[in-house]
Design a protein with these regions (language model features):
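Conserved active-site and SAM-binding loop architecture
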Residues: 1-396
Length: 396
């Protein structure tokens, strides 16, 4: 399958169609916003708490109003005022609220935090015990490379839905970690879906793999689609049929080799990454990994007891493994992590997408993003199956 590189001018051209409007919360550096724009949407304003994420967003979309407040400190009115809309006029309220019930290949043991790995359905997750209290992630904090901390992250999804109740958007699209649907986290998952219904929305959730939508990376995330109940009725969908709104998944994947075609890396960055790897705790394991492997390799292939389980090496014949906020995979030929240009490609970002801050902050910013091509597919499905027929039936 061919990967088609694109630039910000292509994003602007698609967004100028103005098929639907969006307000985005927890917008990060703009991954999901890029996807909505590619689908023909107009992003009216965003909310983002982390300064360096806002800097990145502004560099790429300077005309989009940004509310910098903690979402706990604002309501739907502030967002609607910034967007210039009234209650019920927003087509899509978007959000990726942090929710660490189980973080895939998450944090390592460090001061004040004990961790244990848990294998669920073939994937390794991390349970945290914070200051002696077993929490499964509830009540913990999320740290960012610029020093920001988000407290009580288990509350943030419900803060997002509180804002949704204020605004009454036609649809709600939320993204979260796959682990939210597993094990003990299911109770929390059910609480979320019940809250959707309590504020007047029919909802369905599905785990999607970004590789199924042209993203050269296997990144699994749960996507919630909520539809205001009067909209559901107007377009002829029943509660049980909301699940039919999700986009079809393509069985053909874009490989790393295809995605990296035409990339010209900065040699100074490559040298820095090679040197950094040679000094890292992963170096002995990386040296054991053969160059140009047929399949994606993991540290656990060489350390069955679980050491280096979050270390992975790309195969040019497969999509890249998941890029996280703390770790990019190893290049398939060179013994180093991916460069920023390579990471842009495996995240399906525009080639000229600007990243701000130090190298570590730039890499982290991409690792926290929603891949634009996956969100484009979700947005197109929501538009074609819900928003377009609703507008045709109501002249809205």
């Amino acid at each position: 399958m061919v990967y088609y590189p694109y630039n910000l001018k292509d994003v602007v051209a698609a967004s100028n169609q103005s098929k639907f409007n969006v307000i985005s919360t927890f917008a990060g550096g703009g991954g999901s916003s890029t996807g909505y724009r590619l689908a023909g949407g107009k992003v009216l304003c965003i909310n983002e708490f982390v300064q360096e994420a806002r800097n990145t967003y502004s560099e790429n979309y300077p005309d989009t109003p940004i509310l910098p407040d903690d979402i706990k400190e604002i309501g739907g009115k502030e967002l609607m005022d910034a967007a210039g809309v009234s209650v019920g006029e927003i087509d899509i309220l978007d959000g990726s609220p942090p929710c660490s019930a189980f973080s895939v290949a998450g944090s390592l043991a460090r001061g004040g935090v004990k961790t244990e790995s848990v294998n669920l359905f073939g994937e390794t997750y991390i349970r945290e015990e914070v200051r002696g209290k077993h929490s499964d992630g509830w009540g913990s904090t999320k740290n960012y490379s610029d020093g920001k901390k988000v407290e009580n992250i288990e509350d943030l999804f419900f803060e997002f839905l509180r804002v949704a109740k204020d605004m009454q958007p036609k649809t709600i699209v939320a993204e979260n970690v796959k682990g939210l649907t597993m094990g003990e986290a299911k109770e929390y998952f059910n609480k979320i879906t019940n809250t959707f219904e309590e504020i007047g929305y029919d909802v369905s959730a599905k785990v999607l793999n970004s590789a199924s939508f042209g993203v050269p990376q296997t990144r699994q995330r749960v996507i919630f689609i909520g539809v205001r109940q009067d909209v559901t009725a107007k377009v002829g969908l029943s509660f049980m049929n909301i699940s039919s709104v999700f986009p079809d998944e393509d069985k053909k994947f874009v490989t790393v080799g295809e995605a990296f075609e035409g990339i010209e890396n900065d040699q100074e960055e490559v040298d820095m990454l090679v040197e950094k790897m040679a000094k890292s705790s992963h170096w002995k394991t990386v040296k054991l990994m053969p160059d140009d492997p047929e399949k994606v390799l993991t540290g656990m292939d060489y350390h069955p007891k679980g050491h280096h389980f979050n270390l992975k090496r790309c195969s040019r014949f497969k999509p890249a493994p998941t890029v996280t906020a703390t770790s990019a995979p190893v290049h398939f030929l060179e013994k180093r992590k991916l460069t920023l240009k390579e990471t842009r490609r495996v995240m399906s970002l525009p080639d000229d997408f600007t990243l701000t801050g130090k190298w570590e902050q730039r890499s982290e910013r991409m690792g926290r993003m929603v891949p634009p091509l996956m969100m484009k597919a979700v947005a197109e499905a929501v538009y074609e199956n819900i928003l377009k027929p609703y507008k045709e039936n109501t002249n809205d």
